[in-house]
A protein has these predicted regions:
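Signal peptide-proximal N-terminal region
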Residues: 1-11, 131-135
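A structural preference for short, hydrophobic beta-strand core positions in alpha/beta folds
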Residues: 11-13, 139-142
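Residues that mark the start of a beta-strand
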Residues: 10, 107-108, 163-164
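Short, well-structured alpha-helical segments in soluble
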Residues: 13, 20-37, 100-102, 149-161
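Hydrophobic alpha-helical
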Residues: 45-56, 149, 155, 160-166
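Extracytoplasmic ligand/sensor domains, especially the bilobed periplasmic-binding protein
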Residues: 33-141
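Subtilisin-like peptidase catalytic core
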Residues: 10-20, 113-117
Length: 166
């Protein structure tokens, strides 16, 4: 084809390894070595937040990929950062009325949250939205990223007085 607006478009790829430092290094190489004027990607919220910050420093457009954290585009309100997926705030706002409709307004919730930026903003968004509809948050506990066995968290949930686990 003729490119975009008559200009040839070329692309390069990099590997984030789903690690913030590796993602920043890869993005920096694309900007400095390859002359990238736009970067897209970020398959995790931590990666996207890190690359977003670098792109803002470099004046390069960043189009966030699969990142759900509010912090990707909302926290620092940067001019060059965009997303094409929904965020945690939207999830909380959409989920709370459904939970309330199906479970009632007088609930006590216990939150188990993945301990990184997506989990933190998801927890905050759901708590704000459900408490706005009358729910009470009994506890919010952060679980180690990558944990596969959550059995240690079950007894505290059962003893908390909560009637909903989020």
């Amino acid at each position: 084809g003729n490119g975009i607006l008559g200009k040839k478009v070329e692309y390069v790829t990099g590997d984030t390894q789903t690690k913030s430092d590796a993602a920043r290094a890869s993005a920096r190489s694309m900007i400095e070595k390859d002359g990238a004027v736009m970067i897209t990607g970020g398959s995790s919220s931590g990666v996207a937040v890190a690359v977003q910050a670098l792109c803002q420093e470099a004046g390069v457009i960043f189009m966030a990929g699969l990142t759900h954290s509010n912090d990707t585009t909302g926290k620092d309100k940067k001019a060059n950062g965009f997303r094409h997926f929904f965020n945690a705030y939207m999830s909380g706002a959409a989920l709370a009325p459904v939970l309330s409709s199906n479970m009632g307004d007088d609930r006590r919730a216990y939150h188990l949250t993945a301990d990184y930026t997506w989990g933190w903003t998801q927890e905050e968004s759901i708590i704000n939205s459900t408490e706005g509809l009358g729910w009470e948050t009994v506890n919010a506990v952060r679980t180690p990223l990558g944990a596969g066995d959550f059995s240690q968290f079950i007894t505290p949930v059962l003893n908390s007085g909560a009637d909903v686990l989020v």
